[in-house]
Amino acid sequence: MKYKHIIWDWNGTLLDDTWLCVEGINKSLEKRSLQTITKEIYRKVFSFPVEDYYERLGFDFKKEPFEVAGDEFVAYYAKCFHKVKLHKQVSSALGALEIAGFSQSILSAGKQEYLDQWVKVHGLSEYFMIIRGIDNQ
């Protein structure tokens, strides 16, 4: 076996939450009378650092600090998270990889405390050696 360990991304890879990310950012864009985006545009322009992504969408951080829009998005995402599902076949794929002898981890830009909860809520904790998010938001 050439590879022994698989590192997964959480948002958009295991978790089918792109629709919620688009919905959340569009709420913030609408509030500021900025042009809303589609899922296709989101996939083209989203990047890290997230502040740069917001600026590309038209947010002006001379008028309002990034933290205001960022916190607004995080609050909306948290409020609606219960609607988010895993991508199809995630559980069976993780199980098959575990049976095949691969160890697995998650590396995410999501806040650690939320990431731990989200993985647990979706019943996936048993598949991962390490679940690593960020310490700040």
Where are the regions that the model predicts?
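N-terminal helical cap/lid subdomain that shapes the substrate entry/recognition surface
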Residues: 3-88
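Small/polar loops that bind or transfer phosphate-bearing groups
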Residues: 17, 106-107
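Hydrophobic packing residues within well-ordered alpha-helices of enzyme cores
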Residues: 25, 54, 90, 115-119, ...
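Residue-level recognition of specific faces of alpha-helices
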Residues: 44, 53, 93, 127-130
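Short, acidic loop-to-helix structural element flanking the phosphoryl-transfer center
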Residues: 78-106, 112-116
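Substrate-recognition "cap/lid" segment bordering the active-site pocket of phosphatases
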Residues: 83, 112-137
